[in-house]
């Protein structure tokens, strides 16, 4: 039987895109799926490898022996950012492409980012099940009930390396306070009794600048003390979403359980203009200047 390998890199959101692409390909090719984790040996950013915290069978992870043998007989498909050279045989696409379907026979390894829902949209329900955290404590379950039962808005504010790392800031840029103010206004003009649940990798900053973003009459709750997987799961239970330009943010909204909800995303997604052909947001999402 042929094998589909998804090489993982980056934080949780990126890992989920890479897994979703590999999963969809493995189902469509009737192949077994393996995860290549070689990049995590010395990788500690963003919590390192995180998919083992989700409802994913760990037998999918390649052994050291498999990683040594596999590259000798595969064709690699690469979906990459410009000027990022990864290997000699490439499948390059700056935008969504299905060119590889049917054109690659046998075993294949997918290396890259694959940040477009069309690669795996038809598997959404299964992915929602797979991407559920395996450890959700009672407090988080009770909070999820509150989120589901209110006119809830998940607000994700990404700071972290977007603030501390100059190169990351040049690539991604940072969502401004004005973006959040405009997004909140957009929802308040359409819905009543909104409750804002704020998620962030810098929750203290959010608390400090609450009055710069929210009005005094807004019902705002700051969510903290959870793992990132549980935070994402809680976000997915909200009716409406205001996301940052972050793959973590993207998944919190895309996995939502309320199909009638609105998702607001920043534009442009990247600070570097040439990267915006990689914009991952579905067309139906509302876009507001970041």
From Swiss-Prot:
Optimum pH is 7.5-9.0. Exhibits 60% activity at a higher basic condition (pH 10.2). One of its GO terms (biological process) is O antigen biosynthetic process. Does not require a metal cofactor. It comes from the Bacteria. Signal peptide: none annotated. The keyword Transferase applies. InterPro entries: Glyco_trans_11. Its EC number is 2.4.1.341. Pathway: Bacterial outer membrane biogenesis; LPS O-antigen biosynthesis. Keywords: Glycosyltransferase, Lipopolysaccharide biosynthesis, Transferase. Addition of metal ions dramatically decreases the activity to 0-40%. It catalyses: GDP-beta-L-colitose + beta-D-galactosyl-(1->3)-N-acetyl-D-glucosamine = alpha-L-colitosyl-(1->2)-beta-D-galactosyl-(1->3)-N-acetyl-D-glucosamine + GDP + H(+). One of its GO terms (molecular function) is galactoside 2-alpha-L-fucosyltransferase activity. GO terms for cellular component: membrane. It holds the Pfam family Glyco_transf_11. The keyword Manganese does not apply. Belongs to the glycosyltransferase 11 family. Involved in the biosynthesis of the lipopolysaccharide (LPS) O-antigen region. Catalyzes the transfer of colitose from GDP-colitose to the galactose residue of beta-Gal-(1->3)-GlcNAc (lacto-N-biose) via an alpha1,2-linkage. Is specific for beta-Gal-(1->3)-GlcNAc, but can use GDP-L-fucose as the sugar donor with almost the same efficiency as GDP-L-colitose. This is Alpha-1,2-colitosyltransferase.
């Amino acid at each position: 039987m042929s094998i589909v390998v998804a090489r993982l890199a980056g934080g949780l959101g990126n890992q989920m895109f890479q897994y979703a692409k590999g999963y969809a390909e493995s189902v469509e090719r009737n192949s077994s799926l393996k995860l290549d984790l070689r990049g995590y040996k010395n990788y500690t950013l963003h919590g390192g490898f995180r998919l083992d915290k989700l409802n994913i069978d760990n037998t999918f992870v390649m052994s050291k022996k498999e990683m040594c043998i596999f590259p000798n007989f595969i064709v690699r498909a690469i979906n990459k950012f410009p000027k990022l050279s990864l290997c000699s045989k490439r499948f390059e696409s700056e935008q969504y492409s299905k060119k590889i379907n049917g054109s690659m026979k046998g075993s294949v390894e997918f290396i890259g980012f694959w940040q477009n829902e069309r690669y795996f949209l038809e598997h959404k329900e299964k992915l929602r099940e797979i991407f559920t955290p395996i450890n959700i404590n009672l407090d988080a379950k009770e909070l999820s009930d509150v989120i589901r039962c209110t006119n809830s808005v998940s607000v994700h504010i990404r700071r972290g390396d977007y603030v501390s790392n100059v190169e990351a800031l040049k690539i991604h840029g940072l969502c401004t306070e004005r973006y959040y103010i405009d997004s909140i206004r957009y929802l308040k003009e359409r819905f009543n009794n909104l409750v804002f649940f704020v998620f962030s990798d810098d929750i203290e900053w959010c608390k400090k600048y609450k009055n710069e973003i929210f009005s005094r009459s807004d019902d705002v709750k700051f969510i903290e003390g959870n793992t990132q997987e549980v935070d994402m799961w809680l976000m997915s239970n909200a009716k409406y979403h205001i996301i940052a330009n972050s793959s973590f943010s993207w998944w919190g909204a895309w996995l939502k359980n309320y199909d009638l909800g609105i998702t607001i995303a920043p534009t442009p997604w990247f600070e570097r203009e040439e990267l915006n052909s990689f914009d991952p947001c579905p067309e139906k999402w509302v876009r507001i200047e970041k």
